[in-house]
């Protein structure tokens, strides 16, 4: 849970760097305590950590993907949800679920894939898989370049 919470905070910071206000959904097969197995408990623990460490972020969970996407459904299930609108940062309980979903959406939509974005390293570095298209290589190069410029500006500020 600690590692997922830290990754969530870093991902939210990345979104803000690109001018996007993060709306974070902590995903699970459970909606707000409807299951009490280790995976659902882990995501509830992530939420508790975020409440302590990053209370200004907008997030809620644990919740299913459709609940994250559909605000009216989320409000019916949890009227006092702290997440407004549609989530734009989806936090998965494990790398398997995240990678499967990422690749399925990428293939099914034919959209431009941005990522995966490597976080928590001292220099801009990102991952390109063998399936990366030229467009994806260009996009990831642009992200690395912006990342380097931001880091340089931060160092100059002290």
Locate the predicted segments by residue.
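General beta-strand structural signal in soluble alpha/beta enzymes
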Residues: 58-62, 92-93, 119, 127
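Active-site rim loops that border cofactor/substrate pockets in soluble metabolic enzymes
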Residues: 29-89
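A C-terminal functional module that forms or caps the active site or interfaces directly
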Residues: 83-109, 113-117
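A broadly conserved detector of short glycine/acidic/proline-rich loop/turn motifs that flank catalytic sites
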Residues: 63, 95-96, 131-132
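ATP-dependent carboxylate/acyl-activation modules
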Residues: 1-25, 32, 46-50, 103-104, ...
